[in-house]
Amino acid sequence: MLKPISALNDNYIWVYGRENCPVIVVDITEIEPLLPFLRENKFAVEAVLLTHKHDDHVGGVAAFKRYFPDVPVYGPQECADKGATRIVNEGEIVTANYRIRVIPTGGHTAQHVSYVTDGCLFCGDTLFSAGCGRVFTGNYGQMYDSVQRLKTLPDDTLVCPAHEYTLANLAFAESVMKDKSAVKNQRVLVEKKRAENRPSVPTTLGLEKQINPFLIAENPAQFETWRKAKDQF
């Protein structure tokens, strides 16, 4: 089970679980949409994963901990004062039912991390469908390296970003990429999904390698140029 729960204006709280197992929750934006979903489906929670410190990713953690005080909350050092109880940077988290790879993906924030388990990539604000995150407390070189790190994952990896930015990202991608065919095809599909109020994600890493300019950028300089252009797009 892999479920993006809409929160705030365009955030997704991700819930993932193997059959008959407690679930993992990624980036608790707010408690309100998450709690009813967990209760209606009678899901226990095995772990919470935080990608970075921004309020739209951790704003519901304190409330969650009031309902689930014994659930471990994993996150980078920058989340220590945001509710993280177990600090991670890279390596592996092993719980009763899951093995979760932790990948350092700084750039959007300096200590941002991403998580991979069972072929699902929870990449927060590092990688979006057809885009990548803005650079705030990290730097462009760091963000480029992070995206390159994610690019090495298998093509069938499910990309699970934290925002519904896909249509805007596709518009930018079409403006800068030489081969626009895959971008145009994906835009048609995403427009239909969004018209039906369905999420555009997850996608696959293989697809992202065709439609995401930040995975296609040939060098750090081109990456930085495109990222700065996207900021003004």
From Swiss-Prot:
Alphabetized, the UniProt keywords read:
Hydrolase, Metal-binding, Zinc
Per the UniProt entry, what are the Gene Ontology biological process annotations, in alphabetical order?
methylglyoxal catabolic process to D-lactate via S-lactoyl-glutathione
Broad enzyme group: hydrolase
Known InterPro entries for this protein?
Clx_II_MBL, Glyoxalase_II_hydrolase, HAGH_C, Hydroxyacylglutathione_Hdrlase, Metallo-B-lactamas, RibonucZ/Hydroxyglut_hydro
Which residues of this UniProt protein bind Zn(2+) 2?
Answer: 56-57, 125, 163
Reaction it catalyzes = an S-(2-hydroxyacyl)glutathione + H2O = a 2-hydroxy carboxylate + glutathione + H(+)
Q: In which pathway does it act?
A: Secondary metabolite metabolism; methylglyoxal degradation; (R)-lactate from methylglyoxal: step 2/2
Which residues are listed for Zn(2+) 1 binding in this entry? 52, 54, 108, 125
Q: What is its EC number?
A: 3.1.2.6
Required cofactor names: Zn(2+)
* Tree of life domain: Bacteria
Q: Member of which family? A: Belongs to the metallo-beta-lactamase superfamily. Glyoxalase II family.
Q: How does it assemble?
A: Monomer.
Q: What name goes with this protein? A: Hydroxyacylglutathione hydrolase
